[in-house]
Amino acid sequence: MLVYTKSMVTVDAVEKELEKVVDPELGLPITEMHLVDEINIQENGEILIKYHLTAPFCPPIFAEDIVMNIRNLTSKLEGVKKVTVILHGHALANEINQRVNPG
């Protein structure tokens, strides 16, 4: 049973922060572009966010920029201990995921 406490982060809170993350090429929020595929919040405060880009060959710098913005914004939420962001559907997804998710 999942019991929410005052310090537990919610999907709504994460989504609100993700609305601030803008695609560097198009200038639109990634939430408005429906690029976020999954938000998984664990009881221990770890968050897993899965997303995709608009095309499988978007420049990797865009993917890394989006990841850093996602992580910076969501890691500030009360109760968050760790944020892992996974890119999928990109030609270099494995390499990018290894580079942007330390440990």
Regions found by a protein language model. Name each.
Residues 1-103:
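Domain-level signature for proteins that mediate thiol-based redox and metal-cofactor handling
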